[in-house]
């Protein structure tokens, strides 16, 4: 399954761990093909090692073809509109 992580201020430890499984396409942007177990274990490391926030986008069998999870970004949130995930910007 295709997975993309977008991280803000990730620690070197987390970046090193992610590069074992994924390509760092740009600083803080990791792309790879992971199984669900590895994806969930890596996502579980995010709160301790990327305190400013993170976004995960992964392929999913739904209308959009992907799903999103977000952590620690107070100005944005994920809104569900009839099964479609959208990014809501807080003002």
Label for each model-derived stretch:
Residues 2-91:
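Basic nucleic-acid-binding interfaces
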């Amino acid at each position: 399954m295709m997975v993309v992580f977008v991280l803000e201020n990730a620690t070197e430890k987390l970046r090193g761990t992610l590069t074992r499984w994924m390509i760092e396409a740009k600083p803080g942007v990791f792309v790879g093909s992971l199984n669900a177990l590895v994806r969930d274990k890596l996502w579980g490391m995010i709160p301790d090692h990327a305190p400013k926030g993170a976004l995960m986008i992964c392929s999913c069998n739904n209308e959009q073809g992907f799903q999103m999870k977000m952590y620690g970004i107070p100005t944005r949130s994920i809104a569900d509109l009839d099964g479609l995930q959208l990014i809501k910007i807080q003002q």
